Structure formats: structure tokens, C-alpha cells
Swiss-Prot record:
Keywords: Actin-binding, Calcium, Cytoplasm, Cytoskeleton, Lipoprotein, Membrane, Metal-binding, Palmitate, Phosphoprotein, Synapse, Synaptosome, Zinc. PROSITE patterns: AH, PDZ. Residues 144-357 form the AH domain. A lipid is attached at C413 (S-palmitoyl cysteine). The gene is PICK1. Residues 376-415 are annotated as: Disordered. The lineage of its organism: Eukaryota, Metazoa, Chordata, Craniata, Vertebrata. CDD domains: BAR_PICK1 (cd07659), PDZ_PICK1-like (cd06722). This is PRKCA-binding protein.
Length: 415
């Protein structure tokens, strides 16, 4: 198509500047430099780099990137050549090859169009959908195969639930032990009072000894609380700081992932559009004018992929460290809990074994009599008042005897 025009067609650069340059690359053992080429005759006046593969001479050098235009190979111009011819030119050179290029000075923000934003939103929606649901809704899916982070996320959620359950159980355990220690303290106070008031020396000493044992158990319980409480703090730190921080990192990773997938989907759509126009024999404007829009998306995809790879690496490292901390921390916390409770029960057993004072001989008769001595009977004030009123209203027997018996009229008669 452009042979008749002799490539005398104005390029639509979309305001993106280019800077010429050249780079010499050392080929690898497979005689490759690690780039894929697109464009070229007969549909596009420019021949450009589509992708730079990882761990290849071009990627390790870092000079050329996706979207850069190739203008020559070892000083030979490639104007008017197809991408297959240029690939053969590069393969024919052994050892070092010099690539002449026009560097695309693209701004990634220029490629972040509304279409990319909407694609990111769509990816968020279909992330948790099954393939059947997405197909039924007519939503295309761009997913990462063998994404191990999905399983790691599920493991992280299970770990969070485990720590949450341990935290609640530890709180309840501390609360119960505190109430138990207060109960032992109350027992100690009661038996101490009984021992002080007990007149029998042997029984008094036994009650006091038993009271001291319960007070010691109360101290052991407080010591247990002080030892286990840092465990609760550590669990809360892991649950409320470490895991949320990892979730935030994963959230950032997902945002970068969806952006990268959106650019991948955009590139595929533009490729399909180009292939359709070629099949119909109709020229596509963006391809005929240098395909700068497509090259901009290629550059944005490459940079998004680099960010995605770095973020993925960071997330994997952070989750690996979190797993190691989880394994080490959970063992340490459980050992501290078991050892503390074991010491508590051993100390309680030792104290109660020494305080085996039962049966206690108590002289109940003597104690009851002693408690009952010198105690006046309690009388209610109201009963005393009633007795006084009765005494005032009824004459005494002496008075009635002096006056004689009552007559029929109810008056006293003399005998």
C-alpha cells in the first residue's frame, strides 16, 4: 500500500517526541537479543519493538523498550522492509549487533485513558467470578495462570482467623483466671477470720495456714496473668498490625495487577482491530500514520508489567516473612502459655500439699458456749412499747383484789 506512495505519508505522533540513538547488544547462546518486532511494510511506515523479553541481552541492557522505533541494523536502513526481513537481518549478524532506534518519550499518564480505567473496574468485578458466570454476562477475562498468591491470600485469611480465635480464647482465659484468683483471695480472707476467732490454738493455726495457702494461690494467679498478658499483646500486634499491613500491600499489588491486565486486554483489542482491517483490505488510520497510539499502549504495558513484577516480588517476600514469623511466634506463644500454666498448677499443688490440715478438731460445744456468754437477749423497741401500753390500760391483780368482785352492773363491790 505504501510502495506507491514511497512512504511519503505524514506520521501522527500524538504529540509524543522521539529521540534518535543506537545501542550495541551482545547476542546470547541462541543468537537472539530478546525483542519482538511489529509494524513495517506494507501497512505501517514504522517498524517498532513490541516486547522486550525478560533476562535477555536487550532487557539486561535496558536501553530499548517497547514502542521504540527501529531505524537501522548495523548501519543499514530498514526503511520499506517488513518485520520478517528485519528479523533476518538481525539473525544474520553474529556476536554483537548494533540497533539504531528512535526512542519514544512517552508519558505513562497519557496512556491511562478512560478505557483503561473502566477495564480495571471490570477486572475487579470479574476477579471473584467463575468462568461460566463471566461468559454468561459477556465479560472477557484476562487472568494470570498459576497465580500462587491466590492460595497465599487464602492462607493469610485462615491465619488471621486462627489468631483472632486465639486472642479471644486468651482474653477469656485471663478473665477466668482473674476471677479464680479473686475467689481464692476471698477464701483466704474468710479462713483467716475464722482462724483468728477460733479459740482452739491447733484449729486456729490450721485455719490460718489454709488461709495463707489460698492467698498464695491468688498471688500465683496474678503472676500467671502478668506472664500471659504480653502474649495477648503480641497476638494483637500480629493480628492488628502485621496482617493489615500485608493486606494493604496486597491491595496495592491487585491495583497494579488489574492495571497490567487492562493494558494486556487493550493491546489484544487493538491487535484484533488491526487484523480485521487487514483481512478486509481497509487501511487503519493509526497504523497508516505510524501506529503511535498502539506503541504508547505497548510502552505503558511494559512499565505496568515491570511494576507488577516488582510488587509481586515484594508481596511474596512480605508474605514469606509473615509466614516465618507466624511459625516462630505461634510456637513461642504456645510454649509460654503451657509453661506458665504448668508452673501455676505445680505451685498450687505444692502449696495445697503443705497445707493439708484436714481434719481439723474443733470443740463446737465449748465454742458455742463461749460465743453465747455475756450476750443479752435482744428485744425489739416496738414490743417494749406494746407491753407498756398494756400495763397502763389493765389494772393490777392487787388492785382488783382490794376492790372486791364485780357486780352485775360491772362495778366493783365490797366484800
Amino acid at each position: 500500500m505504501f510502495a506507491d506512495l514511497d512512504y511519503d505519508i505524514e506520521e501522527d505522533k500524538l504529540g509524543i517526541p522521539t529521540v534518535p540513538g543506537k545501542v550495541t547488544l551482545q547476542k546470547d547462546a541462541q543468537n537472539l537479543i530478546g525483542i519482538s518486532i511489529g509494524g513495517g511494510a506494507q501497512y505501517c511506515p514504522c517498524l517498532y519493538i513490541v516486547q522486550v523479553f525478560d533476562n535477555t541481552p536487550a532487557a539486561l541492557d535496558g536501553t530499548v523498550a517497547a514502542g521504540d522505533e527501529i531505524t537501522g541494523v548495523n548501519g543499514r536502513s530498514i526503511k520499506g522492509k517488513t518485520k520478517v526481513e528485519v528479523a533476518k537481518m538481525i539473525q544474520e549478524v553474529k556476536g554483537e549487533v548494533t540497533i539504531h532506534y528512535n526512542k519514544l518519550q512517552a508519558d505513562p499518564k497519557q496512556g491511562m485513558s478512560l478505557d483503561i480505567v473502566l477495564k480495571k473496574v471490570k477486572h475487579r468485578l470479574v476477579e471473584n467470578m467463575s468462568s461460566g458466570t463471566a461468559d454468561a454476562l459477556g465479560l472477557s477475562r484476562a487472568i494470570l495462570c498459576n497465580d500462587g498468591l491466590v492460595k497465599r491470600l487464602e492462607e493469610l485469611e485462615r491465619t488471621a482467623e486462627l489468631y483472632k480465635g486465639m486472642t479471644e480464647h486468651t482474653k477469656n482465659l485471663l478473665r477466668v483466671f482473674y476471677e479464680l484468683s479473686q475467689t481464692h483471695r476471698a477464701f483466704g480472707d474468710v479462713f483467716s477470720v475464722i482462724g483468728v476467732r477460733e479459740p482452739q490454738p491447733a484449729a486456729s493455726e490450721a485455719f490460718v495456714k489454709f488461709a495463707d495457702a489460698h492467698r498464695s494461690i491468688e498471688k500465683f494467679g496474678i503472676r500467671l496473668l502478668k506472664t500471659i498478658k504480653p502474649m495477648l499483646t503480641d497476638l494483637n500486634t500480629y493480628l492488628n498490625k502485621a496482617i493489615p499491613d500485608t493486606r494493604l500491600t496486597i491491595k496495592k499489588y491487585l491495583d497494579v495487577k488489574f492495571e497490567y491486565l487492562s493494558y494486556c486486554l487493550k493491546v489484544k483489542e487493538m491487535d484484533d482491530e488491526e487484523y480485521s482491517c487487514i483481512a478486509l483490505g481497509e487501511p487503519l488510520y493509526r497504523v497508516s500514520t505510524g501506529n503511535y497510539e498502539y506503541r504508547l499502549i505497548l510502552r505503558c504495558r511494559q512499565e505496568a508489567r515491570a511494576r507488577f513484577s516488582q510488587m509481586r516480588k515484594d508481596v511474596l517476600e512480605k508474605m514469606e516473612l509473615l509466614d516465618q514469623k507466624h511459625v516462630q511466634d505461634i510456637v513461642f506463644q504456645l510454649q509460654r502459655l503451657v509453661s506458665t500454666m504448668s508452673k501455676y498448677y505445680n505451685d498450687c499443688y505444692a502449696v495445697l500439699r503443705d497445707a493439708d490440715v484436714f481434719p481439723i478438731e474443733v470443740d463446737l460445744a465449748h465454742t458455742t458456749l463461749a460465743y453465747g456468754l455475756n450476750q443479752e437477749e435482744f428485744t425489739d423497741g416496738e414490743e417494749e412499747e406494746e407491753e407498756e401500753d398494756t400495763a397502763a390500760g389493765e389494772p393490777s391483780r392487787d388492785t382488783r383484789g382490794a376492790a372486791g368482785p364485780l357486780d352485775k352492773g360491772g362495778s366493783w363491790c365490797d366484800s
